[in-house]
Regions:
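Active-site signature of alpha/beta-hydrolase-fold catalytic machinery across serine-
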Residues: 89, 180-184
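Acidic, low-complexity terminal tails and accessory targeting/binding regions
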Residues: 1-23, 66, 99, 107-119, ...
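Short beta-strand scaffold positions
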Residues: 77-78, 151, 172-173
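Phosphate-handling substructures
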Residues: 50-51, 94-154, 215-218, 227-228
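Glycine-rich phosphate-binding loops at beta-strand->alpha-helix junctions
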Residues: 82, 177-180
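Generic structural signal for well-ordered alpha-helical scaffold segments
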Residues: 61-68, 150, 154-162, 182
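Active-site metal-binding loops of divalent metal-dependent hydrolases
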Residues: 30, 175
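Active-site-proximal alpha-helix that buttresses catalytic centers in soluble enzyme cores
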Residues: 2-25, 31-100
Length: 228
């Protein structure tokens, strides 16, 4: 019979990634420059490509400080300049050159690129109401289909995971992309359930083969954002 000193303790399980898994920190780019009717955004491959706003550059610096000690092995950005601008402070701290992953660029908004989506959202356009009601981007004229968007996102995450087993990577991307990743990871019935990651926020995904595990969503503690 065991004595109290010999009793075995059964502690709560602490998560650790499975062997061969990839930890991905998904960072939404910092706040970008505002859309103005008399100064439309430059387009890259048909998509709006604004620079970071001053607030966004501050977000980038804060992200760099937050992730500097997280044992990150590789950085990825998209073809849109706000993502490499956000990644720059962390890249400088780690001495890493970001790689471009084109398929993690933002959803293509068709005829509503060039800042029109922001304008029509502000004005309460009927199609914006339809978009939220139906949980589909492709109600916007000419927009990328949900099937195309979801497919390229899943393929890109799979490629990055396959290239980085047992490593941590940071991916600087966009709000729509992060929302789609976490909707797929959680099998959410509401396709827009995770739409709304804040600028400069950090979300944490663990990928092990076809298994995507949500560890953290929309962490903004480094931005000193109040609740609300």
């Amino acid at each position: 019979m065991s004595t109290p000193e010999q009793e075995v303790e059964y502690r709560q399980h602490r998560f650790s990634p499975p062997p061969g898994a990839t930890e991905i920190f998904l960072v939404r780019h910092g706040e970008s420059a505002p859309a103005k009717g008399d100064n439309p955004f430059e387009l890259v491959d048909g998509q709006a490509d604004p620079d970071l706003a001053p607030e966004g550059r501050d977000h980038a610096e804060r992200v760099g400080r937050r992730l500097a000690d997280e044992r990150i092995s590789a950085l990825y950005v998209t073809t849109l300049r706000r993502t490499p601008q956000t990644a720059a402070p962390l890249a400088a701290k780690l001495g890493l050159t970001p790689e471009v992953e084109p398929d993690l660029r933002e959803i293509h908004l068709g005829e509503w690129e060039n800042g029109l989506f922001r304008r029509y959202t502000y004005e309460g356009h009927p199609i914006v109401e339809q978009l939220w009601r139906e949980q589909r981007w492709d109600v916007i004229p000419g927009a990328e289909t949900m099937e195309s968007f979801g497919g390229r996102i899943r393929a890109a995450i799979g490629r990055l995971a396959a290239a980085n087993p047992d490593r941590r990577i940071a991916v600087f991307t966009h709000g729509g992309v992060i929302g789609e990743v976490f909707a797929q990871a959680s099998a959410a019935k509401n396709r827009f359930a995770f739409l709304g990651a804040d600028n400069g926020s950090i979300s944490h995904l663990v990928v092990s083969g076809e298994n995507w595990m949500v560890r953290r969503f929309n962490d903004t503690s480094h931005l000193q954002s109040p609740f609300g």
